[in-house]
Curated annotation (Swiss-Prot):
Group of enzyme by EC: transferase
A GO MF label: tetrahydrodipicolinate N-acetyltransferase activity
Superkingdom, natural source: Bacteria
Role, per record: Catalyzes the transfer of an acetyl group from acetyl-CoA to tetrahydrodipicolinate.
GO aspect biological process, one term: diaminopimelate biosynthetic process
Pathway info: Amino-acid biosynthesis; L-lysine biosynthesis via DAP pathway; LL-2,6-diaminopimelate from (S)-tetrahydrodipicolinate (acetylase route): step 1/3
Family: Belongs to the transferase hexapeptide repeat family. DapH subfamily.
Reaction catalysis annotation: (S)-2,3,4,5-tetrahydrodipicolinate + acetyl-CoA + H2O = L-2-acetamido-6-oxoheptanedioate + CoA
Protein name: 2,3,4,5-tetrahydropyridine-2,6-dicarboxylate N-acetyltransferase
UniProt keyword Transferase present: yes
Gene expressing this chain: dapH
């Protein structure tokens, strides 16, 4: 299976070197005085930008000096992914950090959390509440079930990430531990905890997960993906 495009040291450097920001939206009443930094956007009586740059502007607010601050991060090093040009279906409430790759016609459902450096193949669905940790790789036409966790590895930097092959189905609430590889065509049963590599075209289940059978025609029918859900 392929290596992640960003290794752990590159991600660590990216985070360490990034300017830490506290992004805010400020709605104010009154008149601002003084020049507005280029990195702060003003639309009517609303400011968008880093709190450290907006705070001094509010000190010069005249008249009633009333304002409301909305924020969802503090000293954040990694912004959220700009999703505007991604050729995939991404539902509201998914949290996807920058430096994530998402293939064509992938589906990211509500509440999914995808950390920096993760890669999602074309046609793969990440279901509701699933978590892909840093550098986790999922191949093409796979399904990561609701509440499943693919453990991430940014530190320690020497650790290997989770790698999931093509045409894999991971059941709801399953957990795949750091460094584990799931072979293409395999099925991980719901609730399984996978601590060792899984070969291709098998079904694993249990805690810890063990091979219980080879993929057969009946299993393929029960775990078949629906292309219609991936239509844009």
């Amino acid at each position: 299976m392929s290596a992640t495009k960003m290794n752990a040291q590159e991600i660590i450097k990216f985070i360490a070197d990034a300017k830490k920001k506290t992004p805010v939206k400020v709605t104010f009443d009154g008149e601002l005085h003084g020049s507005i930094p280029w990195s702060v956007v003003k639309l009517g009586n609303v400011l968008f930008g880093d709190w450290e740059e907006i705070k001094p502007l509010l000190a010069n607010l005249e008249e009633n000096k009333t304002y409301v601050v909305e924020q969802d991060a503090r000293n954040s090093a990694v912004p959220l992914l700009d999703k505007r040009d991604i050729n995939a279906r991404i539902e509201p409430g998914a949290i996807i950090r920058d430096q994530v790759e998402i293939g064509d016609n992938a589906v990211i459902m509500m509440g999914a959390v995808i950390n920096i450096g993760a890669e999602i193949g074309a046609g793969t669905m990440i279901d509701m509440g699933a978590i892909l940790g840093g550098r986790a790789i999922v191949g093409k036409n796979s399904h990561v079930g609701a509440g499943a966790v693919l453990a991430g590895v940014i530190e320690p930097a020497s650790a290997e990430p989770v790698r999931v092959g093509d045409n894999v189905l991971i059941g709801a609430n399953a957990v795949v531990i750091e460094g584990v590889q799931i072979g293409s065509g395999s099925v991980v049963a719901a609730g399984a905890i996978v601590t060792q590599d899984v070969p291709e075209n098998v079904v694993v289940a249990g805690v810890p997960a063990r091979v219980i059978k080879t993929i057969d025609e009946k299993t393929q029918q029960k775990t078949a993906l629906e292309d219609a859900l991936r239509t844009l």
